[in-house]
Amino acid sequence: MSIATEIIGVPETLDHFQSESYSPYHFFSSEQWAKFRADTPLTLTSDEVKRLRSMGDPIDLDEVRRIYLSLSRLLSAHVESSQMLFEQRNRFLSLSDVTKTPFVIGIAGSVAVGKSTTARILKELLGRWPSSPKVDLVTTDGFLHPNAVLQREKLMQRKGFPESYDTGAILRFLSAIKAGRPDVKAPSYSHLVYDVLPDEYKIVDRPDILIFEGINVLQSRDLPAGGKIVPMVSDFFDFSIYIDAAEDEIHNWYVTRFMRLRETAFRDPNSYFHRYASISDAEALEIAEDLWANINLKNLRQNILPTRPRADLILKKGKDHLIEQVALRKL
């Protein structure tokens, strides 16, 4: 099913998408999108793309050419427009010696859909613009509550759900970033030990661009009973991207990745999941299916997928894990 059909119920053909005046998005096939690259140079090598991609993600240099160079050009236009508005506002307010705050890009989407690959590719491409901007990447993993807290609150089976994150810490971090503060600390997370690393931080020092990646970064919040207005994480974004795919495809990618990890990371004795390395394939498959059905699928349906229409750009992947359709919000 197409993005447009799922979001607003319009017919499936691409030609019809683009004629629908009530759609909030422009829709493009990957071939159409690739043409917007114009003269944007390819600044990555094949070996670099292989290094940047996550396990099971087949992205290659051709995919970078087809999708990411046009996206890099689009983001360059948004950053440039933001800079122009900043300068005009300073003139309006008669301000001088004011430093522009970082342009923040949010990237959301399900587990196993390829958010991390997209974030890393964009970080490299954006950092190689002629203007040589300073680009930082932070994920929400470090803002999860420590396992000890999740266990105490009986939330280990809800890890990755909105309530498993220290949302206050996320908001304080992004507030500091947008205030232009130097040396802002982002907590670190280890996928090996499956936990936040105490007293370990990434220092974010006034980048030109910050990429903030996580499954629930577009999540909205209910208004508190007392009526006090609470900001949402996405309030701090200048541009947002949602990585999309059919539910069945994400399921397949998740299970395949889990089985591959048994042959790699899970074999490390320090791995939280080391116990899964020595069980049979049948047992491992059953565990992977259970984790998908009872945790990740529920999170996708209840919390992640409903945020998709809030994105400025939706990248829809096909069965081969490559992007086949792009939806860009109209201005």
From Swiss-Prot:
Q: What class of enzyme is it?
A: transferase
Annotated GO MF terms? ATP binding; pantothenate kinase activity
Q: Where in the cell is it found?
A: Cytoplasm
Keywords (alphabetical) are: ATP-binding, Coenzyme A biosynthesis, Cytoplasm, Kinase, Nucleotide-binding, Transferase
The Gene Ontology biological process annotation of the record reads: coenzyme A biosynthetic process
| CDD domains in UniProt | PanK
Q: Which InterPro entries match?
A: P-loop_NTPase, PanK, PRK/URK
The molecule here is called Pantothenate kinase
